[in-house]
């Protein structure tokens, strides 16, 4: 029924904790899952493959595929690799700096089942990228997984299957239907680190699918986990890490402009969902001239090791 994609670039501790929370949640729901674990060229001393192998040993009754990229793929690459190897009808992608709960999985599966047009379903969190309207912060700091689980359950109890539609995709933890993947393929690999999800959301909209947020689904998000890890290990200041990130965002935006023939803005100013909404409105007239499906290029398999 469910394929679960978890990418990791370094930080085995975060990764193992994330995988443990997923395994606990799906086991409580008696779900048989296919795990697709993608090592994004992590340093050998980070022991990501060891964390993945330990998960395979723990995940009795589930199928686990382990894929390692020899080169850094970043967001669009690891997501697309995961989609290439996922085979189930429903696919869940999650960043490795998150903790999920049984209530979260229940909620996104429930909302996804409400309509065949719901191509992508996300949830809420204590920390959300580009979607401040989906941020739900606990009144007090949650110190244990039991407290996280209890808070998530309270959000589910209060909101059940309530949902709202989104115009822009920020894809840190999302559920996708196989029908969507068959229609628009994987993420466009011209977008290395950023704008891959925005482009994918645009293509989903243009293909007739809806992006929705399950308001009863809540997970814990550490936020920028791999960035914080690399800052610590590469002795980068916050300003240096921010400038490096924004340079990558600008490069990706210029690719987005080129793909969708956008004259303005000439420079991405760091914006967010508001600008992305404007992009969607402006690219809609180009839908008939633009291929919506992007297939995983066979040549990309050359960079991968399968375990």
What is the predicted function of each stretch?
Residues 2-18, 25, 38, 111:
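A conserved hydrophobic helix/loop-capping motif in glycosyltransferases and polysaccharide synthases
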Residues 129, 202, 206-307:
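Active-site-adjacent helix/loop segment of glycosyltransferases
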Residues 153-176:
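A recurrent flexible, glycine/aromatic-enriched loop bordering the glycosyltransferase active site
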Residues 91:
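Short aromatic/hydrophobic "clamp" motif used to bind/position activated sugar donors
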Residues 99-142:
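Conserved donor NDP-sugar-binding/catalytic core segment of glycosyltransferases
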Residues 22-68:
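Acidic donor-binding segment of Leloir-type glycosyltransferases
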Residues 69-86:
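Glycine-rich, basic loop-to-helix element that forms the pyrophosphate-binding segment
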Residues 193-199:
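Acidic donor-binding loop at a coil-to-helix junction in glycosyltransferase catalytic cores
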């Amino acid at each position: 029924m469910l394929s679960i994609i978890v990418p990791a670039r370094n930080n085995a501790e975060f990764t193992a904790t994330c995988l443990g929370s997923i395994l606990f949640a799906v086991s409580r729901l008696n779900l048989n899952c296919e795990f697709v674990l993608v090592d994004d060229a992590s340093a050998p001393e980070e022991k990501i493959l060891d964390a993945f192998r330990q998960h395979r040993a723990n995940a009795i009754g589930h199928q686990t595929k382990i894929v390692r990229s020899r080169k850094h793929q970043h967001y669009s690459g690891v997501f697309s690799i995961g989609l290439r190897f996922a085979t189930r009808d429903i696919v869940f992608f999650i960043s490795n700096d998150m903790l999920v709960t049984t209530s979260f999985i229940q909620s996104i599966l429930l909302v996804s089942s409400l309509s065949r047009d719901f191509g992508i379903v996300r949830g809420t969190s204590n920390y959300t990228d580009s979607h401040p309207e989906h941020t739900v912060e606990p009144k007090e700091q949650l110190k244990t997984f039991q407290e996280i689980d209890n808070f998530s359950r309270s959000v589910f109890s209060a909101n059940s299957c309530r949902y709202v539609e989104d115009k822009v995709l920020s894809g840190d933890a999302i559920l996708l239907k196989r029908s969507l993947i068959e229609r628009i393929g994987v993420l466009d690999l011209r977008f290395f680190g950023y704008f891959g999800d925005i482009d994918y959301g645009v293509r989903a909209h243009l293909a007739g699918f809806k992006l929705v947020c399950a308001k009863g689904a809540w997970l814990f998000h550490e936020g920028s986990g791999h960035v914080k890890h690399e800052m610590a290990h590469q002795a980068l200041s916050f300003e240096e890490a921010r400038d490096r990130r924004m340079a990558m965002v600008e490069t990706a935006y210029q690719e987005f402009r080129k793909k969708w023939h956008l004259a303005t803005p000439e420079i991405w100013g760091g914006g967010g969902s508001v600008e992305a909404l404007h992009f969607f409105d402006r690219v809609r007239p180009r839908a008939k001239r633009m291929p919506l499906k992007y297939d995983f290029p066979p040549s990309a398999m050359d960079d991968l090791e399968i375990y």
